[in-house]
Each structure stands twice: as structure tokens, then as C-alpha cells.
Amino acid sequence: MAASAWCCLRCCRDGGTGHIPLKEMPAVQLDTQHMGTDVVIVKNGRRICGTGGCLASAPLHQNKSYFEFKIQSTGIWGIGVATQKVNLNQIPLGRDMHSLVMRNDGALYHNNEEKNRLPANSLPQEGDVVGITYDHVELNVYLNGKNMHCPASGIRGTVYPVVYVDDSAILDCQFSEFYHTPPPGFEKILFEQQIF
């Protein structure tokens, strides 16, 4: 009994709590290790400008993921999902089997094939927020919180959120603290946790 009391007093005296600190999970952001050579990432990994593409820092492991991009400045851009094999210097993306993206003209491309298209009167403009849902089969697009009902599919393997810009486009990413509530069942990207 005295030994237990002494341990508690020693921990308090040393300023410790006696607990092992938990590591905080890193925030998902744009990954400067997986970006095109002429891409510029600023705002703590949340804003992309320059020319080229960039992957997010975490893959989409969970069943239903949601993320958003806000168009700060128009130009040429695209958002969606891609594997780590995608060439982030060769834009527009969607030209090969390693990316599935919606381009600034509203067309969704995978493997150089147009898979779907936003209605002509619903193209994203400067200031708009584009949400993406992905469930390992289908990618869906939301414009300012509204489902655009233009699904696309076909990509295989481990995918990451991807964005590309050119011609003065600037986009901000939101991987948490969203502008719009994710659709039911979809949530922010979760880092895979390993328990040993």
C-alpha cells in the first residue's frame, strides 16, 4: 500500500501524470512528397497552385470517404482519386488507368474515357465548393452540398484524393471541418491504424 502511494506522489512531484502520452493522429493534407515538379503547396498543405497534380497524404481505406475542394481562382483544374502510379506532371489527369477525375469543364474522366458529365448549367465557378464521395466502387460529385447525380467508376487499387491545377487555378482542400455536411454514411478520411 505504501509503495503505491509513493509511486503516485513521485509521479505528481515529477510533474508527470503517470500515463503514456497518446500520439495525435496527423491531419490529412496535400502531400509534398507526391506532387508535380511545378506545383506549389501553401496554407499548411491545404492550397494548391502552379502547374501539375498532388495526392493527399492518406489513402482512402475506409468504405465511404468524403472530401471537398473550394475553387479560389478559376483556370484549368481537376479533382478526384488516383493511385500513387499516376504521373502528376502530365495534366489533365484522367488520361490513364491511374486516375479518375472531374475536370473543370464538368467531365469525369478515367483511362482517357469520359465516364459522365455535370449538367451544363451546374459547372463549378470561383467560390464554389466541390465535394467528392468515394466508396471503393463509385465516385460522386456534390456542388455546394447538392448531389449532381453523375457517378463514375473504373479505377482499381489503393487510391488517394488527387487535385491538379494549371492556368492560374487555385484550389483549397478540406479533408475535415467541411463546408457542407457529408452525405449519410460518408465521413472524413481516416488514417489506417495499426495495433500491435
Curated annotation (Swiss-Prot):
Provide the alphabetized UniProt keywords: Acetylation
At what positions is N-acetylalanine found? Answer: 2
Transferase recorded as keyword: no
Q: Where is each B30.2/SPRY domain found?
A: 2-184
The record's section on InterPro entries has: B30.2/SPRY, B30.2/SPRY_sf, ConA-like_dom_sf, SPRY_dom, SPRYD7
Which SMART domains is this protein grouped with? SPRY
The family database entries (Pfam families) matched by this protein are listed as: SPRY
The superkingdom of the source organism is: Eukaryota
Protein name per the record? SPRY domain-containing protein 7
- Which source organism? Mus musculus
